[in-house]
């Protein structure tokens, strides 16, 4: 631990925290409440080994944000994705898995077909995408602390009134 602390400079993007002994769930809730990206925890007696292990765990924090729906990408045999943009700008920020229940998924497909529109000018061609006109907002769960959407899933959607 001392060697690692010495390798990380004070101007580094990497933050080195002090040891926080205690119950992992309680510590995670404090980290999540503070708006941090997550935590790395390890068994006190374990040594670092490269590759997957249960001795070292990375626990990530998620948040929910509101975005504008640009379109839905659907290909046979693959999961569907909602293509999302910053609200009001139509600037693409990433995609979110469409992992909602069947009723909501069918309502989404219907809404997408009713609001079909051209792709945003800056977007590369995506043949499997049904683009929509501006006006559909969505709530997306995604990793906290990332510029673009990562590990994102669509939670809900509605017409922007």
Q: How would you name each of these model-derived features?
A:
Residues 1-161:
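Catalytic cores of nucleic-acid ligases and guanylyltransferases
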């Amino acid at each position: 631990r001392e060697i690692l602390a010495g390798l990380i400079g004070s101007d580094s993007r990497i933050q080195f925290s002090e040891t926080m002994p205690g119950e992992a769930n309680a510590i995670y809730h404090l980290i999540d409440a503070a708006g941090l990206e997550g935590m790395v925890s390890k068994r006190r007696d374990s040594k670092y080994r490269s590759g997957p292990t249960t001795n070292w765990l990375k626990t990530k924090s998620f948040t929910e944000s509101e975005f504008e729906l640009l379109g839905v990408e659907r290909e046979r045999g693959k999961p569907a994705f909602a293509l999302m943009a910053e609200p009001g700008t139509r600037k693409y920020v990433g995609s979110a898995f469409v992992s909602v229940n069947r009723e909501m998924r069918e309502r989404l497909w219907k809404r997408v077909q009713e609001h079909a529109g051209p792709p945003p000018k800056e977007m590369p061609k995506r043949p499997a995408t049904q683009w929509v006109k501006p006006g559909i907002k969505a709530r997306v769960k995604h990793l906290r602390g990332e510029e673009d959407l990562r590990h994102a899933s669509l939670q809900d959607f509605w017409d922007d009134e």
